[in-house]
Amino acid sequence: MLSLNQEVHGPKTSEVYGFVGSISIVVATVIFLIWGYVPDKFLESIGIYYYPSKYWAMAMPMYSMVTLLVALVFYIGLNFMSTSKPTSLNTLFDDYSREDVNFLPLMKNGEDRPIDPISDIDITRINDLMFDSHLAK
């Protein structure tokens, strides 16, 4: 029986599952490549008679790639459909936008000015800073 001061040493369950999973993937990949590239006569000579058609050695990766491509196109299209038009003001302002509040609190001589509350920077201010030649320098 373990006391409270003793620790149980050994691998974590997640580490064991990760190791077994990675080894299983390597073994499955090797079996798939052997099945795909070794001639049928050799497989039959070592006693393997039942295996899927060699068509699936090319079809499975191609179906996977096409499925991935269709899912990617669908995902990008769904994102385009769910966003506002570039000319919409909803791309600049929403319910969570915070206007810049300029306030000058009463300060005694020698006191530092407090930090302004957090706010969004107006797009016109950003454009002025980025594209006006006298402000950009």
Curated annotation (Swiss-Prot):
Provide GO CC annotations from the record.
membrane
List UniProt keywords, sorted A-Z: Glycosyltransferase, GPI-anchor biosynthesis, Membrane, Transferase, Transmembrane, Transmembrane helix
Q: What class of enzyme is it?
A: transferase
Describe its membrane topology. Answer: Multi-pass membrane protein
Where in the cell does this protein reside?
Membrane
Q: In which pathway does it act?
A: Glycolipid biosynthesis; glycosylphosphatidylinositol-anchor biosynthesis
Which GO MF terms does the UniProt record name?
A: phosphatidylinositol N-acetylglucosaminyltransferase activity
Q: Which GO terms describe its biological process?
A: GPI anchor biosynthetic process
What catalytic reaction does the record list?
a 1,2-diacyl-sn-glycero-3-phospho-(1D-myo-inositol) + UDP-N-acetyl-alpha-D-glucosamine = a 6-(N-acetyl-alpha-D-glucosaminyl)-1-(1,2-diacyl-sn-glycero-3-phospho)-1D-myo-inositol + UDP + H(+)
Ranges that cross the membrane? 16-36, 58-78
Q: What is its EC number?
A: 2.4.1.198
Primary localization class, coarse: membrane
Q: Which family does it belong to?
A: Belongs to the PIGP family.
Question: What role does this protein play?
Answer: Part of the complex catalyzing the transfer of N-acetylglucosamine from UDP-N-acetylglucosamine to phosphatidylinositol, the first step of GPI biosynthesis.
Protein name per Swiss-Prot or TrEMBL: Phosphatidylinositol N-acetylglucosaminyltransferase subunit P
